[in-house]
Amino acid sequence: LLRKNPIVKLFPCLRESVDRDLLMTDWDHNDTRPVDWVGGGFMVISRDAMMRIGFLDKNFIYGMEDIDYCIRVWKTGLKVYYVHTATITHIGNRPSTKFGWFLFQIYFSTIRLLLKHGFYSRKGGS
């Protein structure tokens, strides 16, 4: 979806940044390491961490709630890890990117995320 974003299409130089920073294509994923964010489809969160951070923000109608949560984890002083040995099998459908409403929700949530956190980076603040 990020690659299909009209802004990325207007500015091809953003494609490399999207691939590297958001899709994490700059490493082979064969080790466990801290990352900026992980997908919300498979997160494991300790009870203590959830008590400190809270729940997912219900203001995100569809999309970006996982990134928002991970930013909140980092801002709390905790870390988000990609665990290379963890696996999950997803069974079922996902909304099609061909539906305008679905894309609208993704774009709306992206704007909401930027308004909430700015251009946050765990490496250098916002």
Labelled PLM ranges:
Residues 28-39, 82, 115-119:
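A short, terminal or domain-edge coil/loop segment
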Residues 67-126:
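Active-site-adjacent helix/loop segment of glycosyltransferases
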Residues 1-35:
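Short, flexible, basic/aromatic active-site loop/helix in glycosyltransferases
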Residues 7-10, 46, 110:
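Generic structural signal for conserved hydrophobic packing positions in ordered secondary structure
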Residues 28-29, 49, 89, 93:
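Generic signal for short, ordered secondary-structure residues
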Residues 31-33, 53-55, 95:
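A short, structure-level motif marking secondary-structure boundaries and short turns
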Residues 36-54, 59-87:
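A short, conserved alpha-helix in the catalytic core of glycosyltransferases
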